[in-house]
Amino acid sequence: MGTYKKEKSRIGREGANEKKPGNLRVKGENFYRNAKDVARVNMYRGGKAKYNAAGELVRAAEFQSSEVPKARIQPDRRWFNNTRVIAQPTLTQFREAMGQKLNDPYQVLLRRNKLPMSLLQENTEIPKVRVLESEPFENTFGPKSQRKRPKISFDSVAELAKESDEKQNAYEEKIEERILANPDESDDVMLAARDAIFSKGQSKRIWNELYKVIDSSDVLIQVLDARDPVGTRCGTVERYLRNEASHKHMILVLNKVDLVPTSVAAAWVKILAKEYPTIAFHASINNSFGKGSLIQILRQFASLHSDKKQISVGLIGFPNAGKSSIINTLRKKKVCNVAPIPGETKVWQYVALMKRIFLIDCPGIVPPSSNDSDAELLLKGVVRVENVSNPEAYIPTVLSRCKVKHLERTYEISGWNDSTEFLAKLAKKGGRLLKGGEPDEASVAKMVLNDFMRGKIPWFIGPKGLSSSNDEINSSQKVATQQTEGSDQDGEEAEEEWHGISDDGKADESESTKPVAEGSASESTDESAVDDNKNRS
């Protein structure tokens, strides 16, 4: 029986009512191999390559063919015409519009990659070289060519004298600024080498961690201490972001607002909000302030970057500013180790806030500055007090920043004239005495420094012009101070007037506001997430 009859009878046996009847296979049809198997078998049958006696290739094998078919590109305008072009008037108009919105902290530029940013940003820092004015073309090329004339950037002696005067004035201004910054410094006195403990936060490892966080973040939160916002700002990082990473967003968070009154916090927020979006914040897992505003602005940035699967938010700032505490507050549980001492966070750490927002904790950094003295670095919380040698030398700075009545109320002592007498009275009251009844000034000084940095002693630095600003803040409402969280105050103390120090470091003797109770603040829900003069509820 032939193949055709066998196949036909097989279909009859299987039944014609099947949904998928078998295909009728005809003799001569290759249904055992597919096209891939056939190509492989043909390669085997092609044989090996043939070579002559000289070893030259005579006939290549099937898989050794080096002949390439001629390729031809489709004559399409998509490949041979300009794709993104813009006329000069349109570019000028767009540059002017960008210049008005570029410096606005509340304007966000989307789809930056599709814009010719190199054409929009003119590099005006490089001065133009007036070649033809300083060196004419005829004296450079041609029969009269000579290059004996020096290349100068001015045309006449008057311009030379003017430029010399400007350089001399700039040099004298730098000398005056140096004298004002270091009034005790003279040319005959050489400053001693700074203790290595005051270089904390400036190591190469710390800066490597910082740049990892900056590179990995879409939004950066700079955490400031509400008691000294200007002293805890990282100007070096802000300039780096402005020049090298302008596509990243910056937010300022004024932490520890429970240690300052509402008027001062509102004044600082109003000043800082002119540069970046600013939020007043109090880090606490159970009783926080500003949490809703911060989450709202992070949601806004996440919605702006809808093309990304998620965004990363990095927290940077000085040591002991409260970066890890803010993350714990947002998560409402302890996910980062926190301590009232600087240097608790050693490496960066990723924390998931929600599905599309991730937080990055960064170690504290201290930008190097020649204007910061050892006492200022210590009082900013950069250095651990237990590692400082001769801590009693920094007590005069503490006494100059705090009011006498605040120290009297905190330590229940009075009647001292200098720092030595203050430490002696405090040591005798606490029973910290050495052999022979001598006061242990070192241990008492460390206790005072810890109380100063942890908020037990009321103090802070207010903005300049707070007393003379009659528009937003009453002249009688000057810088105020408040005791730390958990301190018990009776009604008589709550009615007491509070004073602080202005930005120039001088004590303020006029009337001021009353202290604000902890946790009594209402969160603002405006678009810029900025706290103004709202009562805390």
Curated annotation (Swiss-Prot):
Q: Which Pfam families match?
A: MMR_HSR1 (PF01926), NGP1NT (PF08153)
Mark the residues carrying the PTM Phosphothreonine.
484
| Segments forming domain CP-type G | 207-368
InterPro entries per UniProt? G_CP_dom (IPR030378), GNL2_CP_dom (IPR024929), GTP-bd (IPR006073), GTP-bd_ortho_bundle_sf (IPR023179), NOG2_N_dom (IPR012971), P-loop_NTPase (IPR027417), TRAFAC_YlqF/YawG_RiboMat (IPR050755)
Is Nucleus set as a keyword in this record? yes
Q: Which UniProt keywords apply?
A: GTP-binding, Nucleotide-binding, Nucleus, Phosphoprotein, Ribosome biogenesis
Where does this one sit in the cell?
A: Nucleus, Nucleolus
The answer, when asked if Phosphoprotein is one of the entry's keywords, is yes
GO cellular component assignments: mitotic spindle; nucleolus; nucleus
Q: Which domain of life is it from?
A: Eukaryota
The entry's family comment says: Belongs to the TRAFAC class YlqF/YawG GTPase family. NOG2 subfamily.
- Any idea what this protein is called? Nucleolar GTP-binding protein 2
| Organism expressing this protein natively | Schizosaccharomyces pombe (strain 972 / ATCC 24843) (Fission yeast)
Which taxonomic lineage is given here? Answer: Eukaryota, Fungi, Dikarya, Ascomycota, Taphrinomycotina
